[in-house]
Amino acid sequence: MITVKPIEDNIRKEQLLSRYHCSAADSTILVMKDGVCELGYAAIDLIQGKLLIRNIFLTNGSAQELNAENKIYIDFLMRAAASYGANHGAYQMENCVEELHSFFVSKGFVLEHGICTIPISKIVHVCNPHHT
């Protein structure tokens, strides 16, 4: 079963966040695994209500090689990042990986002036905890 969870190794987390210039308090690395086998990760930053995807890395090769398997993994990481962002107060999502803009546009993101964005509510349903 494929899972995506925030990284547990704090040393690796800090190294990767530094590499991708993630600096917000709620920034993290979301690690995708199939059982114990790591498939990849997304480096995300949360700044002023925006979730920024700083990088996506796949262990089977380049995330920019958009074969069918990689598209599934990138989509999985994108949706997990949106869920993480929604749970941490983000309302907007932005892809910062220029090579993946066309993929994200195919998922509903809007590309304007080199910035690829989408409201998080277009990806995940945000429930009102006070609504019964």
Walk through the language-model features, giving the residues of each:
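Conserved acetyl-CoA-binding loop-helix of GNAT-fold acetyltransferases
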Residues: L66-S83
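Terminal substrate-recognition subdomain of acyl/acetyltransferases
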Residues: D34-D45, E94-T132
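A short linear-motif detector with a strong N-terminal bias
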Residues: E8-I11, S23, L30-V36, K71-D75
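A conserved beta-strand-loop-helix scaffold within acyl/acetyltransferase catalytic domains
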Residues: S18-L51, N55-T59
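Short amphipathic alpha-helix that is part of the acyltransferase structural core
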Residues: M1-A24, H130-T132
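Short phosphate-engaging motifs
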Residues: R12, G49, L100
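Conserved acetyl-CoA binding element of GNAT-fold acetyltransferases
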Residues: G49-E69, T117-S121
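Conserved GNAT acetyl-CoA-binding A-motif
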Residues: S83-V97
